[in-house]
Amino acid sequence: AVVNGVNYVGETTAA
């Protein structure tokens, strides 16, 4: 997912 312009890979929950 992309959150605030930061890409999280292998995430379960991203904030």
UniProtKB/Swiss-Prot annotation:
It is found in: Secreted. Its main location: secreted. GO terms for molecular function: serine-type peptidase activity. GO terms for cellular component: extracellular region. Keywords: Antibiotic, Antimicrobial, Hydrolase, Protease, Secreted, Serine protease. Monomer. One of its GO terms (biological process) is defense response to bacterium. The keyword Nucleotide-binding does not apply. Optimum pH is 8.0. The keyword Hydrolase applies. Its EC number is 3.4.21.-. Inhibited by PMSF and p-chloromercuribenzoate. Unaffected by EDTA. Optimum temperature is 50-55 degrees Celsius. Retains 50% of its maximal activity after incubation at 52 degrees Celsius for 15 minutes. Diaminopimelinoyl-alanine endopeptidase. Has antibacterial activity. This is Endopeptidase L4.
